[in-house]
């Protein structure tokens, strides 16, 4: 591992009734597997249907995401297997599961007895494989399986020799086609997991001393807190799939893989703190 971390903080505005405090943190980490145990070329940390793997291999970054994708020729045209009628495939290293870039921004604004705290959290540079979306596509539950439902599906490209190729899948055979489409090419269910989130917002009010004394207390605060309030940015592909970029379901080594985990929740609460 080789990286850098930067942390900055300051108070841009400090007036008698208004203050603005800010904190920023940035880190970047690069990893590279230098050696594995004798006799081991690839260490598989996790896997899914159709062969997607989270691996460690010498010369590659930690938690590399490897998966089959639809094969294309140098012109970008899909290559088909004439014997099966399906798209040909090839194994590819798509990205890493651990985000190399982490950033956080904290702002606290105070005006009189009120304060507002906003925490922005972001991660960049990683990818994640969604087993959930792969299953849903196999069973015809995603928009990827809409083409051909009314009049059949025509696929075209080149065969493995480079000759033009066309095949028509009748409506009655589409379940077979999409079952293969969803299982044989898991690379299409690997998403960029970049995000910027409003992680936390707190509105706090410091109760006046005159009111606190009525209950014989020293101080009191009332706070409205929200967690995971909004995704301010995520990649278009993962947004259209309706997925949260933080789709990891494990704290283990297989970062970059998600099964059928429960979605992230938004939490809103009120806290009253009284000091006697």
What are these regions (language model features)?
Residues 3, 78-89, 171-187, 246-253:
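Flexible, solvent-exposed coil segments and beta strand-coil junctions
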Residues 11-97, 137, 144-146, 154-162, ...:
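Conserved small-residue
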Residues 4, 16, 113-118, 210-211:
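Repeated loop/turn-to-beta-strand initiation elements of outer-membrane beta-barrel proteins
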Residues 123-221, 225-227:
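Extracytoplasmic gating/loop element in the C-terminal half of outer-membrane beta-barrel translocons
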Residues 1, 44-66, 73-75, 151, ...:
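C-terminal beta-signal and terminal closure region of outer-membrane beta-barrel proteins
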Residues 10-12, 26-32, 111-113, 122-126, ...:
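Transmembrane beta-strands of outer-membrane beta-barrel pores
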